[in-house]
Regions:
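Conserved AMP-binding A3 loop
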Residues: 22-25, 130-158
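Conserved AMP-binding/adenylate-forming core of the ANL superfamily
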Residues: 8-39, 79-82, 148-151
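ATP-dependent adenylate-forming carboxylate-activation enzymes
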Residues: 49, 70-85, 195-211
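Conserved AMP-binding/adenylation subdomain of ANL enzymes
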Residues: 154-171, 181-211
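Hydrophobic alpha-helical segments in the ANL/AMP-binding
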Residues: 3-4, 53-72, 82, 160-162, ...
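ANL superfamily adenylate-forming
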Residues: 21, 79, 92-130, 142
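Conserved pre-ATP/AMP-binding loop-to-beta segment of ANL
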Residues: 7-11, 118-135, 142, 149, ...
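Conserved AMP-binding/adenylate-forming
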Residues: 34-76, 177
Length: 211
């Protein structure tokens, strides 16, 4: 269990996105258990995210269930995606449901606007300490990845929340992508204290951002 999520008030709101979709802490925990039941333990999956409730739910749920997501930009260039796919050959890919038909894989499960697909690739062994993977350069598709450990998640969340004095009453606005280390750090540190994250895909130059 990462970030002591089971100790948060289960009816408290964990995330609200720009569409008004709400995710509670209890729902996040239940979703983690669902992913754990769907996937073989320690499965590698490519997780193509957007800044919305589904992106956070699948990211946290995958990690919390003991699986290992490589978190990527949902709009990564096709050639770069296939390059990563050929190198790492993930047994599962999770994408926004609007993109699922573009990949010719078997649909396993759909929730929070994302669809989990089975690629048919053979499972590979991943290190027991590995929690998730991130690209080294945002959405460029570099085959080099940053490896993160479970203990790093906890330590960073504790350090950041302590340094900034974060509390459950905070309402951070997340505009950084989830496939950026700093973007995920905002998520981890605020979930650690039971805060409510406001996440948006909109740019600060968009009129809708300020409405």
């Amino acid at each position: 269990m990462i970030l002591s999520l089971n100790e948060r008030p289960q009816e408290a709101v964990a995330v609200i996105d720009a569409s008004g979709t709400v995710l509670k802490y209890g729902e996040l925990l239940a979703f983690s258990e669902k992913i754990g039941a769907l996937l073989p333990q320690r499965s590698l999956l490519f997780l193509l995210t957007e800044n919305n409730v589904g992106g956070i739910a699948w990211s946290i749920g995958s990690i919390n269930s003991g699986n290992v997501p490589l978190i990527l930009n949902a709009h990564i260039e096709e050639g770069l995606f296939h390059n990563l796919f050929e190198i790492y050959r993930p047994p599962y890919v999770c994408v926004p449901s609007s993109m699922a038909d573009t990949l010719q894989y078997e649909s396993v499960y759909e929730y929070y606007g994302y669809t989990l697909l089975c690629t048919g690739m053979e499972p590979c062994r991943v290190h027991d300490d590995l929690s998730h993977l991130l690209p080294t350069s945002g959405s460029t598709g570099s085959p080099k990845l940053v490896r993160h450990k479970y203990e790093n998640i906890e330590a960073a969340a504790l350090n950041i929340s302590t340094f900034f004095g974060l509390t459950s009453s905070d309402r951070p606005l997340l505009v950084l992508p989830l496939y950026y280390t700093m973007g995920l750090s905002v998520v981890f540190s605020h979930l650690y204290v039971g805060a409510t994250i406001l996440i948006t895909h909109q740019s600060m130059t968009d009129k809708a951002f300020w409405s």
